[in-house]
């Protein structure tokens, strides 16, 4: 069987999870498959993320947020403004508006939609903060949930079959 996009899906995306401070996770997508996106692609990420949060993470009526530099509708670049315009009246998912990066680990939403460039930067930053915390020998159950070595892989959503993306850590690579 070949693996290909589900009919109607413009671009599959890599999803990941960010631990919420008070329990649970925020699904974030895309985290690296699509560095450049159009508004309709981000809209589809909202659908895929909402379905994943509901059926895999067990969230009833997931709230979908669009990563942006401000909470106001008029904030952002041309992409996020156009995506917000499409998402705000969605009947395909429960859109809760723009989400600023300071709310990534809050309970403001359950799904965070962004392009793969931004999502990958966020993911790498979370990994970096976890590494700094461990180097400082800070023990905390919440921060232990950021340990990427505990995750075998992360799903690529929008495909007709299950496919996990895995990335070896630099220390596991051949020299």
What residues fall within each predicted segment?
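Short beta-strand and adjoining strand-loop segment in the mid-core
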Residues: 31-35, 71-73, 167
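Glycine-rich phosphate/diphosphate-binding loop of Rossmann-like nucleotide-binding domains
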Residues: 38-97
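A structural-propensity feature for long, helix-poor, extended segments
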Residues: 21-35, 153-162
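Short beta-strands and strand-loop turn motifs
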Residues: 27-30, 63-68, 115
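Glycine-rich phosphate-binding loop
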Residues: 1, 75, 80-143
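Short glycine/serine/threonine-rich phosphate/pyrophosphate-binding segments
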Residues: 1, 10-12, 38-39, 121-122
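Short, acidic/small-residue loops that bind anionic groups at enzyme active sites
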Residues: 2-32, 90-99, 136-143
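Conserved small/polar residues in nucleotide/adenosyl-binding loops
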Residues: 165-172
């Amino acid at each position: 069987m070949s693996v290909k996009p589900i009919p109607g899906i413009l671009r599959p995306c890599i999803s990941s999870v960010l631990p919420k401070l008070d329990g649970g996770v925020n699904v974030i997508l895309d985290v690296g498959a699509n560095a450049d996106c159009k508004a309709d692609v981000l809209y589809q990420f909202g659908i895929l993320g909402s379905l994943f949060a509901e059926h895999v993470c067990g969230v009833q009526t997931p709230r979908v947020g669009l990563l942006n530099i401000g909470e106001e509708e008029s904030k952002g670049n041309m992409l996020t403004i156009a995506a917000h315009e499409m998402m705000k009246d969605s009947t395909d998912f429960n859109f809760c508006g723009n989400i600023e990066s300071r709310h990534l680990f809050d309970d403001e939403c359950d799904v965070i939609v962004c392009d793969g460039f931004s999502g990958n930067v966020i993911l790498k930053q979370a990994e970096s903060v976890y590494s700094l915390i461990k180097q400082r020998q800070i023990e905390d159950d919440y921060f232990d949930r950021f340990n990427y070595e505990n995750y075998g892989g992360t799903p690529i959503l929008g495909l007709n079959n299950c496919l996990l993306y895995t990335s070896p850590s630099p220390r596991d690579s051949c020299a």
